[in-house]
Amino acid sequence: MKLQDLHKNYKKISGRTVFLRVDFNVPIIKSVVKEDFKLRQSLETINFLLSKKCKIILASHLGQPKKAGDKKYSLAPVAKHLAKLLAEDITFLDYKKYSNFKIIKKKIDQGSGLFLLDNLRFFKGEENNSKELGKHLASLAEVYVNDAFAVSHRANASVSAIRSFKLPAYKGLLLEEELKSLDKILNPKKPFVVVMGGSKISTKIPIIEKLYDKASYILLGGALVNNFYLAQGLNIGKSLVDRDGLKIIKKYLSSKKIILPIDAIVKTIIKNKKDKISIKKISEIGSNDCMLDIGPATILLFSKYIKKAKTIVWNGPLGMFEDDNFKKGTIIIAREIAALSSGKSFGVVGGGETVEALNLTGMGKYVDWISTGGGAMLAYLSG
């Protein structure tokens, strides 16, 4: 059963109790939310449902807790932060008190407004799509709304099993926008430029294969390009390589669409001495070298293609940007994409590290769409 559109069916949900699956998997340090992008992205759907007089049960996972009720993975800080963003009271259903679904349901039935369940991964069966947990979650509400794009491709009880129990099911407004934006990538205006980075070519090959015929150019950076260099018989020194991806790339070696870096920022490991950082052509890489960023000639090369684009999608950093010595390439390309978006080109950026890099430029607001789910974005685009 397909998820229905929320806007078109708002009369059917008015005044009802809604189970709203959101993605509040955000960084929390010392019980404080450190980055609230995902929370802010959820506000439109929450406010829409509140305007329709709905009682809302918010539900999300957070991290990978090893034991139920682990305070480190509690959503209590999220409840506090979200309440401020919404200027609304939120009843937080702490797992230590509310782990029994009869007690949870009684509390919800007696209350009104907004409720936030504690971490869904505290409940047995969330990650293995337990029908029993799905039934318990479905029993809390009259309507199901999925606004968690990042987990929409996963077989989780709060995404999949819950829908076995015949609740009317809708797409949240954020999920709707995610899909609309990604559909523009699947039906792009030309020239269409794909920028792919990261460490594992094996995780990116499905999307490269799916978009290959539509793409004008595919610009590759990060450690995933080392597979191509190895296949070409080039030395990659001590650079990271995804050995699982070596066989996959052979058919792309002679492609004129695939654009590889021509130089790199390199760390040379010297025994008993300080590591040396330098710019080298790919053909000059030595046995003790690690390629950790694209070089200046590559930045100019990539910029030339990006400036021609009418549609751009970017996933994955182009170097080890978390180190100041190796962030320049990723940051400059992020600026290029942001500068062209919301006007000359339609730009979509996705993936946790990619968004983090974009945020370092202070230009994220100019990008047409920043996806809340890197893995989900890749899954959707790769079909």
Show the residue positions of the predicted features.
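Active-site loop-to-helix "anion-binding N-cap" substructures in soluble metabolic enzymes
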Residues: M1-G383
